């Protein structure tokens, strides 16, 4: 994998704004409005939840690691910014993105075995498909993604800050789950992986279960993170918002002081690529931040260990070059996703997908 996210095709070609994504999807719908009207689909978040579950199911049958599943989900999102969902058999695409991700993550699987497992899992929707169809779909997938197959994930950044922030095993487990869950949103197409990782850390700190409530872990365990969000309620969300607001206020105050001193009109290096490599930051600089600025960020003694850790995290953010506005957006998107998950109906989503597959003979 390429070490430098900032020089990667992911950053150059596969990071969009929300407005860009909305325009792309609208353009795909406008290509065949009759098809859209004839075969309505659930909202995109519910489709993402369903696709995530199916990738997890197929992966477990084969024994694949989380990294492979994550890469497959990114491929799926990229592909569906180029091709309308209703033009494809999603089960064939799910099989193919997982097959291709296995190759890229250096754990290749035989195409016949992958096809056999997929047909066993979705017999009514893939009964007419053979390995040749997966091979054809793979060619189309690579072509539509312009052979941009290297994917930078947030997991490495999360592991890189575990000791830095003194994260407990429960906090790491919850943060890992939040990262798993972000693949059911548009965040992999919107923000750099280190921003997602830091957002996951913040949410793990403020939504962390009590001592007698086990944290959720594992692949795609969004029920655990959603339950933690529900248990924390508005208080946990408010704590996250306050931490980000404090960090942003310190950044703005520092910028104003520099401007007043005649040293420049903005925060030096804010969002610069030099200090935001794949890990998102320099460990040495971050240690200095924690030791040097945390005292200034904590004017009074904090007795709650969790609140103290959140405040230290906010102080570190203020002294870093991390895009705090992007973290705010990530936080809002994830909280909104957990709320949306409450309305998810698996049976309805499956029926809507199967309806257009059968009607258009895409299962043959």
Curated annotation (Swiss-Prot):
Protein's organism: Chaetomium globosum (strain ATCC 6205 / CBS 148.51 / DSM 1962 / NBRC 6347 / NRRL 1970)
Disulfide bonds listed in the record: none
Subcellular location: Nucleus
Region described as Disordered: spans on this chain: 268-303
Entry keyword set: Activator, Cyclin, Nucleus, Repressor, Transcription, Transcription regulation
One GO CC annotation: nucleus
Entry protein name: RNA polymerase II holoenzyme cyclin-like subunit
Keyword Repressor attributed: yes
An annotated Gene Ontology molecular function: cyclin-dependent protein serine/threonine kinase regulator activity
Cyclin N-terminal domain residues: 53-143
Subunit details: Component of the SRB8-11 complex, a regulatory module of the Mediator complex.
GO BP: any one term: regulation of transcription by RNA polymerase II
UniProt cross-references to PANTHER family, sorted A to Z: CYCLIN
Cross-referenced CDD domains: CYCLIN_CCNC_rpt1 (cd20513)
Function per UniProt: Component of the SRB8-11 complex. The SRB8-11 complex is a regulatory module of the Mediator complex which is itself involved in regulation of basal and activated RNA polymerase II-dependent transcription. The SRB8-11 complex may be involved in the transcriptional repression of a subset of genes regulated by Mediator. It may inhibit the association of the Mediator complex with RNA polymerase II to form the holoenzyme complex. The SRB8-11 complex phosphorylates the C-terminal domain (CTD) of the largest subunit of RNA polymerase II.
Annotated signal sequence range: none
Composition bias, Low complexity: 273-289
Superkingdom in the source lineage: Eukaryota
Family: Belongs to the cyclin family. Cyclin C subfamily.
Main location class: nucleus
